[in-house]
Amino acid sequence: MSDYENDDECWSALESFRVKLISVIDPSRITPYLRQCKVLNPDDEEQVLSDPNLVIRKRKVGVLLDILQRTGHKGYVAFLESLELYYPQLYRKVTGKEPARVFSMIIDASGESGLTQLLMTEVMKLQKKVQDLTALLSSKDDFIKELRVKDSLLRKHQERVQRLKEECELSSAELKRCKDENYDLAMRLAHLSEEKGAALMRNRDLQLEVDQLRHSLMKAEDDCKVERKHTLKLRHAMEQRPSQELLWDLQQERDLLQARVQELEVSVQEGKLHRNSPYIQVLEEDWRQALQEHQEQASTIFSLRKDLRQAEALRTRCMEEKEMFELQCLALRKDAKMYKDRIEAILQQMEEVSIERDQAMTSREELHAQCAQSFQDKDKLRKQVRELDEKADELQLQLFQTESRLLAAEGRLKQQQLDMLILSSDLEDSSPRNSQELSLPQDLEEDAQLSDKGVLADRESPEQPFVVLNKKHLSQTHDTVPSSSEPPEKERRRLKESFENYRRKRALRKMQNSWRQGEGDHGNTTGSDNTDTEGS
């Protein structure tokens, strides 16, 4: 706006035009703009406009320039902008540039009606911009909501992934624990098997020792029986030995026989003398025959005794062999019985071991079946949980999609409502303005009262009535959407009437403000012309 950066240079450049500025400017006309630019506070404005010491307009302008000079470069720029808006010719003289804002020129050229038309056009443009910005804002809100929905979906998926990771970690920990337990059980089973094998080996050794002791006991019993038999034989032999009386009788018979033999020998010696006698010869022959027979009988007896002794020896040997064979047979029978009992015990143990093995295998198969069934049930439950999680995620996704569609529908509904408002405003712009000019005098007093109350609010936020009207229209449309009893023509007519009332009131307020400013400008212009002529 200015070519000067230093405050002193800015205001020193305006000192040459101070007399012209004081003579032309009306402080009541530019103070609202200066206050809007925040270079003039309400106290300064009250001092400039309402101070009883400042009755003359030129003194008011001088005080205003002094106040603005204290604000520095910002006050200088705001003052030049106010000159550009309200005093374009003076701005051209001071800066040597053409003003870019031509509000006062429009007032001078086309009058108040042209200014009103221009203001209405600008208001409509601003309203259209507000509508576009509102639509853009709604679309951005919808996009933000969609992003929030996507963010919630992403968070849901992240939570699900985290939950799956936690489940995987828990499953891996449980699998590791099961493996450790299985390893411990296998180790315990191996130790128990080793202990069982050691116990079986000790049992077998003890059984062998018992069998050996039993065999030794049986041998001792057999030896005892053999000794008992020998003892019985000796006792029987002692019992069969001849008695002492029989021995004495046999001894007497032997003595008698010896005496007779001696007598016979004596008689034989005596009979040698009478050998030649026939009687003696006969006796000798008889004696020889008897002796020969006796010798034959003795040899026969001797042979028979020899045979008897041999038979008795053979009989004794056979009896001994028989007894030995009987003892061997008894020992073999006992050994066979022992081995039979041992085999039966081993077979019984094998049957018991096989029964225990079958029971262990059956219990192991049952445990495996139970474990497999539990794993299947666990897998089924996990599958059901996973399916339920997927269903929940799908339902939540459908809920989010429904919410996004609902938000999109609301955005489209808002856009349609804004389009309807734009269409109604276009229809109002195309309608003849003479009806408005005819209806202006009728509502002038009422609108003047309303304008006096709401002029400050209109200056601060010119878009607020349109927003309120838009909110009313949205509320009406939301109220009328569920109830389809009212026709759309009636709703459009109501909207058109409310918008016409708003435009009428807005135009009246603008016209009153422009009339007041025009009267002040006219008086100031005449006064400035008089002062210029006087100064010239």
Curated annotation (Swiss-Prot):
This is Caspase recruitment domain-containing protein 9. It comes from Rattus norvegicus. GO terms for molecular function: CARD domain binding; metal ion binding; protein homodimerization activity; signaling adaptor activity. Keywords: Adaptive immunity, Coiled coil, Cytoplasm, Immunity, Innate immunity, Isopeptide bond, Metal-binding, Phosphoprotein, Ubl conjugation, Zinc. One of its GO terms (cellular component) is protein-containing complex. Residues 425-451, 472-536 are annotated as: Disordered. Zn(2+) binds at D3, C10, H73. Changing T526A: Abolished phosphorylation by CK2 and increased activation of NF-kappa-B. The lineage of its organism: Eukaryota, Metazoa, Chordata, Craniata, Vertebrata. Maintained in an autoinhibited state via homodimerization in which the CARD domain forms an extensive interaction with the adjacent linker and coiled-coil regions. Activation downstream of C-type lectin receptors, by phosphorylation by PRKCD and/or ubiquitination by TRIM62, triggers disruption of the CARD domain-coiled coil interface, CARD9 homooligomerization and BCL10 recruitment, followed by activation of NF-kappa-B and MAP kinase p38 pathways. Zinc-binding inhibits activation by stabilizing the CARD ground-state conformation and restricting its capacity to form BCL10-nucleating filaments. Signal peptide: none annotated. Residues 487-502 have a biased composition (Basic and acidic residues). Pfam families: CARD. Residues 6-98 form the CARD domain.
